Amino acid sequence: ANLFASFFEKELEKDQIIISPLLEIKFFKRPKTLKQIHCLIFTSSNGVKAAGQAANNNIRALCVGDRTTNLASSLGYSAEKIGDNVEQLLKTLCKGKKIASEILHIHGKYTKGDLVNQLRDAGFLCNEWIGYDQVAQNLSLPALSAFENGDKIILPIFSERTALLLKKQIPTLDRSHIIAISSAVANVFLNVRAGSVSEAQTPDLAGMKSLTKKVLQNVLLE
């Protein structure tokens, strides 16, 4: 959240940027058996953080997105980007040469889809480890005040669960401009009265940054 907010410090005053995460990441203790696995799947940067530093540089990391891949590489993994989303990763792995060794998917407590069983059905030896929890949080007082005051608000939303939590806490978003990382996030707001709902061209940090800047410029001109 802090990294994303820093992209807009030139366009906005400090008090115009409100950081109020709706999810708190809590990492679990790593199992000792983790060091025995030589091929990991990371579908988010939090999965990489949960795994921590690679035991050696021969551990293969199959990653979703540039940010996840770069982080895995910086922590010593032999990291490969296998698509921009889980669907692309699954399709690429199923089309390519089968991986003979065990694969471990490291993900959070709340995850969409069933990647592990889909890979098993495709003939892979795949297991999973829940490396972290995503604990729901209430909006901060400054964030609530902004909604109550009727301010124009730009809301970059990076996950479907975050979107659902926001919708539950703030059912009316008619002064809010929602920046959705994916169609799944945008669809959460189909029946919500919002100022606007826009979907990033690519489901990653770069796509969200680009769209947020564009919407911000339009809102500032209103």
Role assignments for model-derived ranges:
Residues 1-222:
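Signature of uroporphyrinogen-III synthase
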